[in-house]
Amino acid sequence: MKKLAVVLLSGVSLMLSAQEAYSQGKVEVTWENTDKYTDVRPSNESRKRFKERTFKQLDEYLVELAEALPEGQTLNMTVTNLDLAGQVWPASFVGIGNGANDVRLIKSIDIPRIAFSFELLGADGTVLQQGEQNLKDMSFQDRHNPFFSSENLRYEKNMLRMWFEEQFEQNLAKS
């Protein structure tokens, strides 16, 4: 009996680690198979802590965007891939030191990308919109970005903001 309980608990733990969900009022975000994402590499912190912080910051920003939805509407998103702008390199490779530190170097060729499915639900639970998105912003360094240059994930947030405003334009006009 003890073995069965341990096996069941291990299975539940494995399922939870493969799929992280965040729910806050008008939006629910599920980060699916995060170990297979293209690029969520930290520069100078543990991989686990960096992923948690990155997902939390994007979750909080999506909550902020969803506040503009009409009362009763809920956005459900399942993120299947994330590729942050730039690449992580040893600091010595980019000419800013010779220590063991890493840095994320942002160049125009390393564009931000995010893949997800979404559903926008009405107050009665009916599906108002749904779809699959593979967002990428090839002009991320050239376009207007309302975020401060010191803000984390500013390119990814700007890409999500532009998608949100375009995708839900009709819904936002009604609120």
Short names for language-model regions:
Residues 79-122:
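Surface-exposed short loop/turn segments
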